[in-house]
Amino acid sequence: QHDGCVDEINEYLEGVPANKELPDTIAAGIVPHAGWTFSAALAAAVFSAIKQQHEKVHTFVIFGAAHSYFGNSPAVFDRGHWVTPLGEITVNEDLAEIIVKSGQAVSDSGAHRNEHSIEVQVPFIQYLFGGAKIVPIIVPPSRGAITLGQAIGDIIGKQDKKVVCIG
């Protein structure tokens, strides 16, 4: 499974034009979240652009669409790790805790159980930014999403390590 996943990632990355002119600083990226057949080429372009500017990213805060989560508040997966065909990736528990304590999201790992919008991004992060951590957040469509984004912007601004948001 590992080799097939790496081969597929490389295939998508090879389709990305090299050294595109980019904005001064990429702080965030928008990525599609369909299966790789439909969305990986664009996701590869986004992650490649981030890599072009930032050789190392400490943490990716990943916002995911809520397809089967019907809670009112954004749900943070705030403990442990996720597993993909490329192995484990660690949740940045410290940053996740700060986000939950902001009052704009709740701790709810179960909300992520039947969602796919975040997990399709994680292998790109593992492959291109080995050692990076994640903070996965399922975000229902509500005004609270805007408030959450503002709070996370403030929180990230106080971090001393490189954090990039993906959604």
Language-model-derived ranges and their functions:
Residues 1-167:
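Active-site histidine-anchored catalytic micro-motif
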